Amino acid sequence: MLRSFSHFLQIGSRRQPTYFRCFHKTTVHLNSFKNDPKKELNSNLNEKSVEESSKNETKEQFNSSSIPRESESEGKTASNTSPLSPKKVENLSKLFNDINEDVSIEELKSRFKDHLPFYENYIRNHPLAIEALQKSTAPRQTGLKLNYVSKLDKYVTPLDGYSHLGSEESNGEIPDKWEDFKDDLTFEISSKFSPFDFGDAGKSTSDAEFLSDISGIPKSDLRALMFVPLVRRRVVNQTRKGKIASMYVLTVVGNRNGVAGFGEGKAESYSLAYKQSCGRAVKNMVYIPRYDKRTVYGVIHKKFHAVRLTLRSRPAGFGLRCNPILHEICRCAGIKDISGEILGSKNGMNTVKAMFEALQSQRLPEDIAMERGQKFVDVQREYYKQT
């Protein structure tokens, strides 16, 4: 035991032994309590009070040494305004009076070398400095006309400056787009699936007005539309701040008479995502050709990503015998007789997109006749016309 302790207390060792370092710390800690703690606290408080009083005196001297401006009366004596000698005050007042507005900053520094606080006071009250401050606080004026996105946009009609969209003048400017839908939209039906409030006209803003402003379709024709949300799911985006959750909705819109469209929406809540998808679906409505206004033309094969879709025309009274998602799209588009099947993936989002691409890629008899260079005649219709 003695050997080990003497080994740790070797004088020639490079590193202090652990026992010795611990003992040294305890001795320093005990020595700090030799004096009375009450006396030390009182002395520290006295020193702080002296320092604060000296700082206050210097501040009072600086405030009292301010030089009178041109607007102040010249009859005031230097002894009343500042503790400086009267000669220094006279020299400084002459410097202030001799300075013009066009004097550079370097000249001011050379004149006020010995009195920097007076130089700072003059710079603050200089007219050029005041103009610079006013320009910095004023809004920046640029030639760019940018519309910045704000969270308040969802509470305001987004097209306030385009009130002419729903008028007859705007419809006349785009006749090709409007004439395709004009005859089909006359079919009115009270839809139970409409999420919008078509209330009294006395209301300030409504979702129906929002849709009419976006699409250019009158509010009366929006009553014939049918809104069906087909895909609803919760989406999570992983960021460095954490997981940010949002709702995704895919909605199909149609008037049950040859016009349909789909739209996607993503927002924090389900209601906002649903309204967003409905607005985009109304904007994306397209005309869908139908044979005899009830079925498709022939057999359609479509592949969209991993979805392999097949649609077949069927006779009258056959009904809709297909996937539930295809069933709702056919109802919105006004297709009454069809059979279809889906092979491969049955993802709802890709199924809707594959269905709309298939309906728009139909080969019409008129197109086939033009390709072959032959006359096209529907024998069945011509036969029943004669009888």
Curated annotation (Swiss-Prot):
Oligomeric and partner information: Component of the mitochondrial small ribosomal subunit (mt-SSU). Mature yeast 74S mitochondrial ribosomes consist of a small (37S) and a large (54S) subunit. The 37S small subunit contains a 15S ribosomal RNA (15S mt-rRNA) and at least 32 different proteins. The 54S large subunit contains a 21S rRNA (21S mt-rRNA) and at least 45 different proteins. uS3m, uS4m and uS5m form the narrow entry site of the mRNA channel.
SUPFAM superfamilies associated with the record: dsRNA-binding domain-like (SSF54768), Ribosomal protein S5 domain 2-like (SSF54211)
Matches recorded under PROSITE patterns: RIBOSOMAL_S5, S5_DSRBD
Pfam families: Ribosomal_S5, Ribosomal_S5_C
Main localization category: mitochondrion
GO cellular component: mitochondrial small ribosomal subunit; mitochondrion
Domain S5 DRBM: 225-288
UniProt-recorded Gene Ontology molecular function terms: RNA binding; structural constituent of ribosome
Places the protein is found: Mitochondrion
Phosphoserine: residues carrying this PTM: S85
Protein name: Small ribosomal subunit protein uS5m
PANTHER family reported for this sequence: MITOCHONDRIAL RIBOSOMAL PROTEIN S5
InterPro entries per UniProt: Ribosomal_Su5_D2-typ_SF (IPR020568), Ribosomal_uS5 (IPR000851), Ribosomal_uS5_C (IPR005324), Ribosomal_uS5_N (IPR013810), Ribosomal_uS5_N_CS (IPR018192), Ribsml_uS5_D2-typ_fold_subgr (IPR014721)
Residue stretches of biased makeup (Basic and acidic residues): 48-60
Transit peptide, residues from-to: 1-22
Family (UniProt): Belongs to the universal ribosomal protein uS5 family.
This protein's encoding gene: mrp5
Record keyword Ribosomal protein present: yes
Record's keyword terms, sorted: Mitochondrion, Phosphoprotein, Ribonucleoprotein, Ribosomal protein, Transit peptide
Function according to Swiss-Prot or TrEMBL: Component of the mitochondrial ribosome (mitoribosome), a dedicated translation machinery responsible for the synthesis of mitochondrial genome-encoded proteins, including at least some of the essential transmembrane subunits of the mitochondrial respiratory chain. The mitoribosomes are attached to the mitochondrial inner membrane and translation products are cotranslationally integrated into the membrane.
GO biological process, one term: translation
